[in-house]
Amino acid sequence: MSKKNNLLVAASGTGGHIFPALAVSKEVEDEWNIHWLGIQQRLDANLIPQKYNLKTLNLKTPRKNIFLFYQYIKILMSTFQIIRILKEKKINLVFTTGGYISAPTIVASKILKIPIIIHESNVVPGMVTKYFGFLCNYVLLGFKETNSYLKNCKTIFTGTPLREQFYKFNFLPEWVPKGNGPLLIVMGGSQGAKAINQILYESLEFLIKKQFRIVHIVGESHLKTFHVKNSKNYIQKKFTNEIAALIQNCDLVISRSGAGTINELMEAEKPSILIPYPYSKNNHQEKNAMILAASGGSVLINQNNMSKEVFEETLERIFKIKSKKGKKNYEILDLMKKNMENNNKIKSKNEIKKYIDYFLKEF
């Protein structure tokens, strides 16, 4: 058997950075030895398989613009650490998904003339992609629209890779409320979302009265604040590993609009109400949500405009029953479903694998 080359995967932070990197790693692990680089304070080590040779750096992520002077110093110091790692592990190629760990990794790789691929999941590119992307051999895009922001980069549209469970059908978990009412999945991303939790809490009586079945992923940090006793039609969880099954089998998703969520909804062809996080960098969550809203598969509600009345009126409109030829259906919901089916889907991890494996010919 020929000796494998070494791939460094640099990914840390939220699920939006980590899950695409995990999907790609799994896809290429037969051809590459995977080494994972993350930030100790910004990575759940339990998510990374032991075989991926995890290495973490003790770096404090900047709270503000990474291009303030003192941040240059931090990046410089981190770069020296990463150069040492790249040499020790004899890395042949670097793949990263953005975030603070990416900047020094890209610089270190460029100094050592190691090829670099970065994947950008959001419509509006993050600061690392925007300012360091030109140093990379390829900038892979989750959305075609991102190309207009990166004129000086070698960009290729690949889509965003998802967790494996989204590429197969999953049965609804037994613990989900039973009944004939529409099933809502309410979630706020890996960090939880206080505003979404609050509006659901305020509207819970209305939802149960209307016979909605609700699975509420509240997020660990908000579990105590928004704890509501589970009932026949309402289940609250801080986290679940069965998110693909829930999304695939529900009627509507209510969520933030991180890039990962948008792509999961597209893969599952599932309608949604999207409430973008208003403080996301470059307002990227709203730009993400606009992709699905423009297609007619989602209703976009800005958090500043959100209220109990707006939320309940939106649900009533989506789930308004209309009789047609003696048959009752949700006309608006059915139209949203049809619009989601028309969204182009791409097997992203296969596309990304092609560009990673391209470099095998170079070694």
Curated annotation (Swiss-Prot):
UDP-N-acetyl-alpha-D-glucosamine binds at T14, G15, G16, N122, R163, S190, Q285. Signal peptide: none annotated. Its EC number is 2.4.1.227. GO terms for molecular function: UDP-N-acetyl-D-glucosamine:N-acetylmuramoyl-L-alanyl-D-glutamyl-meso-2,6-diaminopimelyl-D-alanyl-D-alanine-diphosphoundecaprenol 4-beta-N-acetylglucosaminlytransferase activity; undecaprenyldiphospho-muramoylpentapeptide beta-N-acetylglucosaminyltransferase activity. The keyword Nucleotide-binding does not apply. It is a peripheral membrane protein. Keywords: Cell cycle, Cell division, Cell inner membrane, Cell membrane, Cell shape, Cell wall biogenesis/degradation, Glycosyltransferase, Membrane, Peptidoglycan synthesis, Transferase. One of its GO terms (cellular component) is plasma membrane. One of its GO terms (biological process) is regulation of cell shape. Pathway: Cell wall biogenesis; peptidoglycan biosynthesis. InterPro entries: GlcNAc_MurG (IPR006009), Glyco_trans_28_C (IPR007235), GlycoTrans_28_N (IPR004276). It catalyses: di-trans,octa-cis-undecaprenyl diphospho-N-acetyl-alpha-D-muramoyl-L-alanyl-D-glutamyl-meso-2,6-diaminopimeloyl-D-alanyl-D-alanine + UDP-N-acetyl-alpha-D-glucosamine = di-trans,octa-cis-undecaprenyl diphospho-[N-acetyl-alpha-D-glucosaminyl-(1->4)]-N-acetyl-alpha-D-muramoyl-L-alanyl-D-glutamyl-meso-2,6-diaminopimeloyl-D-alanyl-D-alanine + UDP + H(+). It is found in: Cell inner membrane. Its main location: membrane. Belongs to the glycosyltransferase 28 family. MurG subfamily. PANTHER family: GLYCOSYLTRANSFERASE, UDP-N-ACETYLGLUCOSAMINE--N-ACETYLMURAMYL-(PENTAPEPTIDE) PYROPHOSPHORYL-UNDECAPRENOL N-ACETYLGLUCOSAMINE TRANSFERASE 1. Cell wall formation. Catalyzes the transfer of a GlcNAc subunit on undecaprenyl-pyrophosphoryl-MurNAc-pentapeptide (lipid intermediate I) to form undecaprenyl-pyrophosphoryl-MurNAc-(pentapeptide)GlcNAc (lipid intermediate II). This is UDP-N-acetylglucosamine--N-acetylmuramyl-(pentapeptide) pyrophosphoryl-undecaprenol N-acetylglucosamine transferase. The gene is murG.
